[in-house]
Amino acid sequence: MSITKVHARTVYDSRGNPTVEVEITTENGLFRAIVPSGASTGIHEAVELRDGNKSEWMGKGVTKAVSNVNSIIGPALIKSDLCVTNQKGIDELMISLDGTSNKSRLGANAILGVSLCVARAAAAQKGITLYKYIAELADARQDPFVIPVPFFNVLNGGAHAGGSLAMQEFKIAPVGAQSFAEAMRMGSEVYHHLKILAKEQYGPSAGNVGDEGGVAPDIDTAEDALDMIVKAINICGYEGRVKVGIDSAPSVFYKDGKYDLNFKEPNSDPSHWLSPAQLAEYYHSLLKKYPIISLEDPYAEDDWSSWSAFLKTVNVQIIADDLTCTNKTRIARAIEEKCANTLLLKLNQIGTLTESIEAANQAFDAGWGVMISHRSGETEDPFIADLVVGLRCGQIKSGALSRSERLAKYNELLRIEEELGDDCIYAGHRFHDGNKL
């Protein structure tokens, strides 16, 4: 079944910034998708096309991307008469229309909105759920489906919050739950106890939340954050069942080959900046003291040698985000140089569903794990919930149990788990190997 109408408009993300919504119409009805955006974006990501007109939306308008859907992509798709179930053909057509290596002409935000819409329309055409359709596209097993472990970002720092804390995300993972529903309850309880502790230790404003829903107290160090998180876990009685993850996002504090954990201070003393080896020692001290099972972006996006040296010394999950940017060329290099053991997959880093699926399978083929991720500028669109189940990734991060744009994904996973019943399993302690379960 071919597409009869394509329409894009400007809507707003969770930070109040403009973003692109796309609608596609077929004989089966109308289908929508909204594109998210990041704050700590990697320089190697596909280009999110912004207007740059400082007199409107502070330069963050997306009218160019919207126009590219309405005047270029839409007419070309309708003229092509490609069936909506030809995901690869449609995505390749848009890539060809763009004609650049990073989607800078039409914008990854324009192309992705159409790509996700097409998948929804195709699932409806085939009369199956979106996650089942994605599983078919990826040639992934469906017997049983795997429901992911949620990595809740319960405490925000770095570019996602105020305060002086350098590292961006402190996450909890209910690996000891028996189901996603139980994981949600456990996460909710820990999160609310953490809020209470934050207010007690840092005052009422410490309960305020960052971009991704986590509390954002004016904490100085990672140890302060981890102490409070572990205390909240223990209060709930979940010691050993709820583990911890960190996303350092250090590209924002990488300076002259060193890492400035005091980067939010304008007059930070360079003599206190850490060398890659010193930062590794710091990570090892945290790993010894806290129940950390996952480190994301321990080093900057082009500090390749530090990544590979560090991986040799640890036995926890090391996630590549800014290093790889869901880009097949960079993923291949990271695999070759043994820089990480897990890929963070963000749809808008690469810009089409087809390329995202290819990136996931590339990682799986190398024995890596894959974590599906939201962005800090999110929307109510729950597409990644279907994506993580369809790809059997076993793990997802979509922020804290706060803010509706975060809960939209988690609530959709609750529905999927309930719908599948005995035809699904919760990844639990084997979150890294979801595709092998």
Swiss-Prot record:
Keywords: Glycolysis, Lyase, Magnesium, Metal-binding. Belongs to the enolase family. The lineage of its organism: Eukaryota, Fungi, Dikarya, Ascomycota, Saccharomycotina. It comes from Saccharomyces cerevisiae (strain ATCC 204508 / S288c) (Baker's yeast). Mg(2+) binds at D247, E296, D321. This is Enolase-related protein 3. The keyword Magnesium applies. Substrate binds at H160, E169, E296, D321, S373, H374, R375, S376, K397. NCBIfam families: eno. One of its GO terms (molecular function) is magnesium ion binding. PROSITE patterns: ENOLASE. Pathway: Carbohydrate degradation; glycolysis; pyruvate from D-glyceraldehyde 3-phosphate: step 4/5. It catalyses: (2R)-2-phosphoglycerate = phosphoenolpyruvate + H2O.
